[in-house]
Amino acid sequence: MSRPNPKAVDPNQELKERVRAFWQEHPCGTKFSDAEMGTREFFDRVEAHRYGKEWHIPLAADFSSTRGLKVLEIGCGLGTDGAQFAKAGADYTGIDLTEASIELARKRFELAGLKGEFRVSDAENLDFADETFDVVYSHGVLHHTPDTAKAVREIHRILKPGGRAMVMLYHRGSYNYRIGIRVLRRAGAGLLKSEGGIKIVHRLTGEPIDSLREHAQLAQANGGSSTDDFLSQSTDGAGNPLARVYSRREARDLFRDFRKVELRAYFLNKRFIPLIGSLLPRSIESALAARWGWHLWIYATK
């Protein structure tokens, strides 16, 4: 498979630019730390939040298995997972669509004394030669790019024969999508028309007041949200221009060029499980997530 022509006209360029602008302004994970951005304390709090809430990630990613391997992370964000690969002894490269995330990821590695290479790059047009990497990892990123199928083809191209991809996409069959977003958030959207309603939704869901007010302002300015817009803004915040969900069948189809594909689901958004969500032990949470988890992990071997 040949490398894409970087000079070719991209029909999704306008949408991709809006995606880039959103994440440039809101680097993923920054809202989970109130420490000064770019400090050691800032990164420590981001990491504690990530692996406290999404405690399955170290298990699912199996960072230690990448020792001595060339690893590419597509959408490295703040470098939180990237740091785990580097600590495990991987030859790590992280790319992101935004300069803001790359700058923060570099700072995180610098503070921790870790080695890694970083560059701004587009998942749909990777600037790497064929068969460069042993592992390609991407957590919660490719459902935000306009042509996800093209990005997956790029992963296949740059992987060595026998190389493996680990990709997380939002799961269409999840409780979070079918109930949390399509039912509970839709019902709650009507309450956002008043300050009292905003406070009710805040108490019921734990969603920050400022975030709910931003959702309300956007809905009022746009005259409501289409189904696609509502999904996008219900996943990663008000103003998020693009997010998609995938069924297991759709995920398998995306990775059809790979020799072997395995799917696993993780992570229940327990805020949307009334009364008992916060009380669930991890054993039950894991069992439920295996069927209805929000994060659909695709393990694909070239």
Segment roles from a protein language model:
Residues 164-220:
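Conserved class I S-adenosyl-L-methionine
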Residues 124-135:
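A short acidic, Gly/Pro-enriched loop at the edge of an enzyme's catalytic core
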Residues 37-69:
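Conserved alpha-helix/loop element of class I SAM-dependent methyltransferases that forms part
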Residues 66-125:
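Class I SAM-dependent methyltransferase SAM/SAH-binding core
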Residues 240-265:
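Short alpha-helix
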Residues 149-161:
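A short glycine-rich, Lys/Arg-flanked "PGG" loop and its adjoining helix->strand segment in the class I
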Residues 1-48:
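N-terminal, positively charged/glycine-rich alpha-helical extensions of SAM-dependent methyltransferases
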Residues 259, 281-302:
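Core SAM-dependent methyltransferase catalytic element
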